[in-house]
């Protein structure tokens, strides 16, 4: 009996029981990327800057469950980012590289950085740190007008996850593409925005192996 209880406890700790979980749609389980990971974040474009965000987890038996679902906003000019400042959201398969934000947050499995006044996301294409998170305490040689002073982006950057678009920092290809909280606008500059409470839920659950796919409703099933 004790062994059975211990095994059940271990399973709960590894795969928590989600109060609002439901079976993921069949097409999610059939995605090629679903064979490569145990977590999927999906941004499915609806129309214009309107989208739907969902978060899915796979259990020991290979069954997928949807644990988060909510409306989302993408770039003001829709999909297909190709350059810095084009107000478009990139399409494709990505991962999350870091979690950070203005608010405190505890328990994020991939780590979490609470930002301070020294933190910028570098948008200066001439900088060796283009599309990277920096502190001016250690690096100050970049154009701050072209970069994002993270702590100023309230309420959007209360909680953030960096999406791995242009991870190699190719100049002028685009920077600072995040999953972040809603702002007063019903669009973004190229990021994906969801309600703050849902963003907190994502931070509670996201793991290193999480894959995020982003595209139109027409194309999202091709991944």
Kindly label every feature range from the protein language model.
Residues 195:
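Conserved "landmark" site that anchors the functional core of diverse proteins
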Residues 22-189, 198-223:
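Cell wall/extracellular polymer interaction/catalysis modules
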Residues 8-16:
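Bacterial N-terminal signal peptides
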Residues 2, 16-25:
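Bacterial Sec-dependent signal peptides at the C-terminal "C-region" and cleavage site
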Residues 1-7:
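Bacterial N-terminal signal peptides that target proteins for export
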Residues 192:
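Residues that recognize and position ribonucleotide moieties
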């Amino acid at each position: 009996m004790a062994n059975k209880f211990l095994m059940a406890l271990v399973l709960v700790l590894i795969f928590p029981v989600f109060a609002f979980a439901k079976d993921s749609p069949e097409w999610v389980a059939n995605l090629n990327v679903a064979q490569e990971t145990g977590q999927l974040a999906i941004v499915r474009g609806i129309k214009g800057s309107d989208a739907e965000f969902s978060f899915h987890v796979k259990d020991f038996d290979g069954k997928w469950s949807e644990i988060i679902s909510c409306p989302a906003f993408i770039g003001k000019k829709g999909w297909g980012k190709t350059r810095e400042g084009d107000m478009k959201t990139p399409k494709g398969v990505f991962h999350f590289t870091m979690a950070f934000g203005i608010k405190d947050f505890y328990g994020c499995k991939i780590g979490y950085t609470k930002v301070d006044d020294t933190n910028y996301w570098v948008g200066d294409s001439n900088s060796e740190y283009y599309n990277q998170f920096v502190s001016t305490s250690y690096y100050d040689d970049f154009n701050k007008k072209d970069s994002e002073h993270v702590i100023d982006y309230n309420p959007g950057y209360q909680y953030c996850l960096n999406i791995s678009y242009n991870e190699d920092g190719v100049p002028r290809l685009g920077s600072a593409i995040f999953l972040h909280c809603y702002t007063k606008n019903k669009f973004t500059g190229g990021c994906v925005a969801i309600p703050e409470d849902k963003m907190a839920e994502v931070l509670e659950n996201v793991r290193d192996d999480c894959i995020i796919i982003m595209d139109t409703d027409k194309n999202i099933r091709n991944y």
